[in-house]
Design a protein with these regions (language model features):
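Interfacial segments of multi-pass membrane proteins
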Residues: 136-142, 303-319
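Membrane-interface alpha-helices at helix entry/exit sites of multi-pass transporters
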Residues: 108-109, 141-154, 316-326
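Transmembrane alpha-helix interface/packing and boundary motifs in multi-pass membrane proteins
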Residues: 120-122, 282-301
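Transmembrane-helix boundary and interhelical linker motifs in polytopic inner-membrane proteins
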Residues: 96-105, 130-144
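Membrane-embedded alpha-helical segments of transport systems
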Residues: 120-124, 148-170, 325-337
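Extended non-transmembrane interhelical loops and adjacent amphipathic helices
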Residues: 111-140
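Predominantly cytoplasmic-facing regulatory/coupling regions of multi-pass membrane proteins
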Residues: 1-113, 171-291, 330-351
């Protein structure tokens, strides 16, 4: 998912970045400012509702959620819900740091931008619409410039996801897979090849990440890119200390994800050691990051990948599926619902 987002590029248009000429009439601006938000809210709400309604195993998972509110282990579900706010709070802080070169925004505004990004991401291929949801909270002249900056944040997250996923694959290769435990369609030979390929690309991404300034200057020398350099110039200003800080936030956010999964796996009695489950979660995140998906099939992919991986450790298929569904509901659907509400108050243009 993150890799597709990194390759995604939004071309200049009136929605993201306007020329300085005031070519929109006042009535048109009023329409965009006061009607687009509510229209987007209705569309997003209906789309999210249809996605939830069409998901398999949802009624059973909902019953499991209701039962989980009671009992000695109910704190785990509450903790997972609380960690959702921590998770997106870390992402909001990253966004605030990333865009400060083009516009200073408050943490709360960054938080709303993240939630709105999730609302649109849930309705677009591989979540690429997330960028649009975020940049509408910036001034119209800064939106396209912020797209390049947001890619830096996605790159930091994919570096963490790939690095931890590779370690997880090594653990899977050496401690889990044997004659009776194997992943369907993936033998040790292909697994070794996958690890080498992923290691190569992780190194490439790390080099790109910490050489953004040099790389941006190099790209600016390409003739047909020269007239667009204004949109990527801010990438030159990132110091390695800032990049390290963003990478650290991505790593902490990643750990929050892992803890959420571990808590729910324990809640639903998926019996295995914490180390085994933890590294398997890392492999799962890697799969979700590199396999393209469409919104309506995202939960299906999560569920199938979870069954394949955690099925190597436990026969509790129902607990594995419940975990995948509830994580999707808490981390994806709830923020998307909040974001669809926030978008009502968005003003796309100055009056």
């Amino acid at each position: 998912m993150f890799i597709t987002q990194i390759l995604f590029y939004i071309k200049p248009n009136a929605f993201l970045c306007l020329p300085k000429k005031n070519f929109l009439k006042r009535k048109q601006k009023i329409f965009f400012n006061y009607f687009i938000g509510p229209i987007a809210f209705i569309w997003l709400s209906f789309s999210i509702y249809k996605q939830i309604k069409n998901q398999p195993n949802l009624p059973e998972a909902w019953e499991a959620i209701k039962l989980s509110f009671y009992g000695a282990s109910s704190w785990k579900l509450y903790a997972v819900f609380a960690l959702m706010f921590v998770n997106w709070g870390l992402e909001a802080k990253k966004w605030q740091l990333l865009v400060k070169g083009v516009q200073t925004i408050s943490f709360f505004r960054a938080y709303r931008a993240i939630f709105t990004g999730q609302a649109i991401a849930l309705n677009t291929l591989n979540g690429v619409g997330e960028y649009v949801g975020r940049v509408v909270y910036l001034k119209d002249g800064n939106r396209l410039r912020a797209v390049a900056l947001s890619i830096v944040g996605s790159l930091s997250q994919i570096i963490v996801t790939m690095a931890m996923g590779i370690i997880g694959l090594i653990y899977l290769r050496t401690n889990v897979l044997d004659e009776t435990h194997h992943v369907q369609g993936l033998n040790k030979f292909w697994l070794d090849g996958l690890m080498y390929a992923l290691s190569f690309w992780t190194i490439i991404f790390i080099l790109i990440y910490f050489q953004l300034s040099w790389l941006t200057k190099l790209i600016e020398k390409i003739p047909f890119v020269a007239k667009y350099t204004f949109y990527i110039q801010k990438l030159e200003d990132f110091h390695w200390k800032e990049l390290t800080r963003i990478l650290l936030l991505s790593f902490i956010r990643y750990l929050v994800f892992v803890v959420q999964y571990l808590l729910l796996l324990e809640l639903f009695k998926v019996d295995a050691s914490v180390m085994q489950l933890g590294w398997m979660v890392c492999v799962l995140f890697l799969v979700l990051a590199i396999v393209p998906s469409i919104p309506i099939a995202e939960l299906g992919l999560r569920g199938e990948a979870s069954k394949q991986l955690f099925g190597l450790l436990s026969t509790n298929t129902l607990g594995i599926v419940f975990t995948a569904v509830i994580i999707w509901l808490i981390n994806r659907v709830i923020p998307a619902i909040a974001g669809s509400i926030f978008i009502i108050g968005v003003r796309l243009f100055k009056k």
